[in-house]
Amino acid sequence: MDNQQLPYAGQPAAAGAGAPVPGVPGAGGPPAVPHHHLLQQQQAQLQAFWAYQRQEAERASASDFKNHQLPLARIKKIMKADEDVRMISAEAPVLFAKACELFILELTIRSWLHAEENKRRTLQRNDVAAAIARTDVFDFLVDIVPREEAKEEPGSALGFAAGGPAGAVGAAGPAAGLPYYYPPMGQPAPMMPAWHVPAWDPAWQQGAAPDVDQGAAGSFSEEGQQGFAGHGGAAASFPPAPPSSE
């Protein structure tokens, strides 16, 4: 039974479909199937699957339910995990086992169709996640089997793709290409250090000439600090040199 060709499996390619076309370069394989034709083929395979399962269920006898693909004890234990469940009949785990088997088969077929779309012969986790996202009845599994995020290419953290020209910013934008150039939230961005203008020595002011206006000197100190800290503010003349100690 396991080695038989199932009626809903993919049909082999017709003879001569992969024959090379003379005079057409690169036409050695079969032509690409349009997207709407591919969807029709997938829908036909799913319909054939359920038609075959219906026929198997109608032809099933009592002896067929003695052999199970899934352990009934495990299914019964899961059913008893619900506090509202008191008693379980002998037929209930059998029906649950068959329902779980159909669920696994349909999800596998839908995942395999996604793998074939991507020209792969290996079923991957992303195929299962894509099949869940495409099917409305499987939406309860979206959070359980999330789709894998695209892996970062080498050099994407520096703002350019691997193999690209130096200094070329990635097309994903600054948020995706330059994640390390932004400080964490709540911390100020690094700035260029401003020139520090030290306060005048009180001894200079005490020994200054009596004709020097102290208020003007204080206002000059404030204007000078603002001009230096602003990087390009109005230029101010330097104050007179301190008096000589001689």
From Swiss-Prot:
Compositional bias annotation for Low complexity: 9-21
GO cellular component: cytoplasm; nucleus
Keywords, alphabetical: Cytoplasm, DNA-binding, Flowering, Nucleus, Transcription, Transcription regulation
GO biological process: flower development; negative regulation of long-day photoperiodism, flowering; regulation of transcription by RNA polymerase II
Alphabetized CDD domains for the sequence: HFD_NFYC-like
SUPFAM superfamilies, A to Z: Histone-fold (SSF47113)
Inducing factors: Circadian-regulation under long day (LD) conditions. Expression increases at the end of the dark period, peaks in the beginning of the light period and gradually decreases during daytime.
A Pfam family per the record: Histone
Keyword Nucleus: yes
GO molecular function, one term: protein heterodimerization activity
Assembly information from the UniProt record: Heterotrimeric transcription factor composed of three components, NF-YA, NF-YB and NF-YC. NF-YB and NF-YC must interact and dimerize for NF-YA association and DNA binding. Interacts with NFYB8, NFYB10 and HD5/NFYB11.
Membership in a protein family: Belongs to the NFYC/HAP5 subunit family.
Role summary: Probable transcription factor involved in the regulation of flowering time under long day (LD) conditions. Functions as a repressor of flowering, independently of HD1 and GHD7. Controls flowering time by negatively regulating the expression of EHD1 and HD3A. Component of the NF-Y/HAP transcription factor complex.
Protein name: Nuclear transcription factor Y subunit C-2
Native species: Oryza sativa subsp. japonica (Rice)
